[in-house]
Amino acid sequence: MQRSLVGSEMCIRDRLYTAVLPASSGGYGVVSNVYAFTALMLVLLTFGMETGFFRFANKSGEDPMKVYANSLLSVGGVSMIFVLLCLLFLQPIANLLDYGNHPEFIAMMAMVVALDSFQCIPFAYLRYKKRPIKFAAIKLLSIIGGIGLNLFFLLLCPWLNVHFPATVSWFYDPDYLVGYIFISNLIISAVQMFFFIPELRGFAYKLDKALLKRMVVYSFPVLILGLVGILNQTVDKMIYPFLFEDRQEGLVQLGIYAATSKIAMVMAMFTQAFRCLLYTSP
């Protein structure tokens, strides 16, 4: 269910982005490039601790709440350090990634990936406690909210700006569509934190170094596998713009490439479904 919901959201968002962002603007290329780095950082900041939490929470002789507290403290601490470093060296990082004119893109997505990384642990806790309704409700509300905000900024605001400019002119910039995509993501990630307030209180936040060390050692292979998997999916979108002397042309071509690759993914899904059906048929 979760995969189908996320897949539906991605399909709707990609269709919206390719329709609203002109190919010549390179906007979809920017979105694809930034989200590729975001996916990589999400794997790094969780460093396999979600799997480690499940392993040790279900292990006899371990206190599940102590395991949960150590998972929250470790992932939360790493995420906070990551955000602070990104904000401290924001302009150099933006220059390195060729977003010197829009360092706020880096700042917003750094906060998004930090929030999403931290929230992986409460989501895992809901699964551990066998609370699928709240898990699915948060996911569903986040998806609906994300789509709604994208529709608001990318479709409704441009229409209002033309027909009733006074209603949106005080905050809306028609040339900042890519920025509104990242703003929408940040809003949803921040609001989602409030749903986890009950899961973030009622127990002692005490770091157990011995337990944490064992959890990190167990989770490290998961981190390596996660990095290999995510790089296989995203490294092309990370390096694509750097293959062109003209940065803008690189983003334009990346947008086209990323959009067409989504079609290939859908074709691969249908092919795989056909093979599974064929091999399981009597």
Language model features: what each stretch is:
Residues M1-G7, I12, Y279:
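Single conserved hydrophobic/aromatic residue that forms the stacking wall/gate
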Residues S8, N33-V34, V43-Q91, E104-A107:
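Membrane-water interface segments that mark the loop-to-transmembrane alpha-helix transition
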Residues R13-G27, A94-N95, L227-V266:
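Helix-terminus/linker motif at the lipid-water interface of multi-pass membrane proteins
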Residues N161-Y180, V191-Q233, L243, V252, ...:
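Interhelical loop/hinge segments that connect adjacent transmembrane helices in multipass membrane
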Residues L40-M41, G76, M80, L84, ...:
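Alpha-helical transmembrane segments of multi-pass membrane proteins
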Residues L45-G61, T260, A264-P282:
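Helix-loop junctions and terminal segments of transmembrane helices
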Residues G27-L45, P221, Q253-Q272:
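Alpha-helical transmembrane segments of polytopic membrane transporters and translocases
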